[in-house]
Amino acid sequence: MRRLLPGPDLEDPDLAQLYQYPPGRWLRANMVSSADGAASHEGATAALSSRGDRHVFALLRTLADVIVAGAATVRAERYAPVRRRELWDHLREGRPPTPPIAVLSARLDLDPASRLIASAPPHARTIVITTATAPPERRAELAERADVIVAGRETVDLNTAVDALADRGYRRLLAEGGPQLLGQLVAAGLLDELCLTIGPLLAGPGASRIVAGAVSPRPLPLRLAHVLEDNGFLLCRYVIKDHLSPNEPWCAPPPASSWGPRLRFSSAGAAWFTAAYSMGAAAGRAQTRSPRRRRGR
């Protein structure tokens, strides 16, 4: 056992280094939770966030090649195309100004006139991932305004979907929801990393867990890569155990520097230690990240 806090303060360049993707294809999920795992408090998620959390949320979107979400999450949260002013603009150098959003929908229950589809810029057209049995007329209608990928016959095959995205050059993936999608990613062995913000409050019972779907036969071991602290909010970054070696240069902490008031780094050298939790037990009940809910906090 060792004390992680307090640790050295960091500056934005150090923060960007902490969250850089490793080489190759990598799928990261981003969640938020109260200390007791609740998804919201009194119907809102504002109490679960902080300035530093929102700062990292924007960074994760900036670093991603594509943002992946399920159709139910997109409809419930009224997704819109990512706006350039929301990102760390200098970190997009050499890439399109904003990442596209990829929506998974087996039945294509999506509105072609929605902002997400109709207002997407040419460099980041919305991607719709569907099935071979989806209504052909709906597929043709959506294909006029979005890029459509067929992955699977009756249900979306996530391995095929992720391969198709990688073939298009989208190798750094960020999953923002929902719990069903995250559960399917875990079951398919596609999840590489979980970023989880834990807010310092007890919200009480009532929210769903971080992962939905079939019960896992055993807990999924995680490695804790780092913890950041922002006024009591803990920003944890876990990597699926054995997906990376502890000796990878990508795992090493940044140099200590004078950081500013927002976040503090709380990792012990390049060492890793295994989280003694499953994704459900570690996070309890958590909120998938959505731009609408986070802007409304």
Where are these regions (language model features)?
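Enzymes that bind and transform nitrogen-containing heteroaromatic metabolites
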Residues: 1-253, 263, 293-297
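N-terminal compositionally biased or targeting/leader segments
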Residues: 247-248, 252, 256, 279-284
